[in-house]
UniProtKB/Swiss-Prot annotation:
GO terms for molecular function: acetate transmembrane transporter activity; glycolate transmembrane transporter activity; symporter activity. The chain crosses the membrane at residues 33-53, 77-97, 103-123, 148-168, 183-203, 206-226, 262-282, 303-323, 355-375, 404-424, 428-448, 464-484, 493-513. Keywords: Cell inner membrane, Cell membrane, Ion transport, Membrane, Sodium, Sodium transport, Symport, Transmembrane, Transmembrane helix, Transport. This is Cation/acetate symporter ActP. HAMAP family: Acet_symport_ActP. It is a multi-pass membrane protein. Transports acetate. The gene is actP. Belongs to the sodium:solute symporter (SSF) (TC 2.A.21) family. NCBIfam families: PRK09395.1, PRK12488.1, sss, symport_actP. It is found in: Cell inner membrane. The keyword Membrane applies.
Amino acid sequence: MKRVLTALAATLPFAANAADAISGAVERQPTNWQAIVMFLIFVVFTLGITYWASKRVRSRSDYYTAGGNITGFQNGLAIAGDYMSAASFLGISALVFTSGYDGLIYSLGFLVGWPIILFLIAERLRNLGRYTFADVASYRLKQGPIRILSACGSLVVVALYLIAQMVGAGKLIELLFGLNYHIAVVLVGVLMMMYVLFGGMLATTWVQIIKAVLLLFGASFMAFMVMKHVGFSFNNLFTEAMAVHPKGSAIMSPGGLVNDPISALSLGLGLMFGTAGLPHILMRFFTVSDAREARKSVFYATGFMGYFYILTFIIGFGAIMLVGANPEYKDAAGALIGGNNMAAVHLANAVGGNLFLGFISAVAFATILAVVAGLTLAGASAVSHDLYANVFRKGATEREELRVSKITVLVLGVIAIILGVLFENQNIAFMVGLAFAIAASCNFPIILLSMYWSKLTTRGAMMGGWLGLVTAVVLMVLGPTIWVQILGHEKAIFPYEYPALFSISVAFIGIWFFSATDNSAEGNREREQFRAQFIRSQTGYGVEQGRAH
């Protein structure tokens, strides 16, 4: 089961190769000057965009949502840039490299949550909200309690992701660039703060768009060169891969990674519903002018991501053929230099030489920056908009709210750097699974039921949401990953790797039970207000658009 965890941690889309994704002792590579030069070009260009964006950020709306003036196509690219991480690129191609067909199952598994967002969430979310998903959840429920719960759910997810990203960034850069781990972590943290602090959502959006274009171009070129090598025949690709892989034809069969159906189902539900509860993804739907553009955003994003995950499958099989069979990329013991997660990087060298290797290495670093910038902005908005402006200091001016948001960015950045350094040698793979479980168990049920269930009340949302969050955390702690591997106990109290199946069930049952038994006057008033909310969610009547958004 440890092998399962290692493989899954490598594929979780925001882990950015944290923890087991780069397993064992990290072999520091020689300083890659091509990669460093290309990355510096990217940094200078994106800092120029940040300067340009800073001149256009004049209001709260500009800072949180780029004024609502991002088009559906641009937002689709940015969402793809936010979601496709270094772990998607290196981790899934490594999974295909080691296990073959199973890698395709996992890569496509990440797309399962997007139809839910497209058909159930995107349109209503945009029509009901302004800056954060808490705007939607609290539309007819009590502002204070719901915003506190939503902000806590968001901040926990953001914190877990940021730690995983920072550790992953340090390890990855140590591998690819030959830079010191601590320097890498500080560099990522400082750049992240600069993008968000000065450029807000506009700069973050364009960093994500540029990163998505670079990643799609790099992956497309690699897949093209692999297919060119086999005469553009998938039959030749698979035949040659089977001929050189140690497992032979077994790499074309599914089921080699997950033997426990409960864990597989729990992981699948966590990924599917967790995607629809990630605060930095949901926040992107408020950057477009209306619900139509929000739908288009998901349509384009799903297309870009689907294309990308197909490319990773080709890249993985190409690595089996061109890297796995080439002793040049092996160490004295016969293992891949730098570990299996370097398969795609070695393939870049095999198909494009040292210059293209530098390009792919720089893109991997840019990928991490784009993801952490989105996470930081989501965390800052949860504090400044949900907690400060709507709970603790009602009636705060836009200027005060923006000041709190920027202070939060600095605090989050410093904390992320410190924790990134402290967790250098820790197994933090569980944090990614826990982040998905919390997003699926706390954020998603409240968002979905607040929009679709007329009988939902504040009491039900609060009890069910907190129960889901606490259950996810407790079961994760009592499970094999933390209880046995980290805390050193002999046997896990909770036998499964991932808690989502159980914590999601607890959340939905809790919300239903405590809402159904709520006979208070406040509860009845909230039920009566559902019709007005439903009309607004369907028609967008009263929603602020464009620059007035």
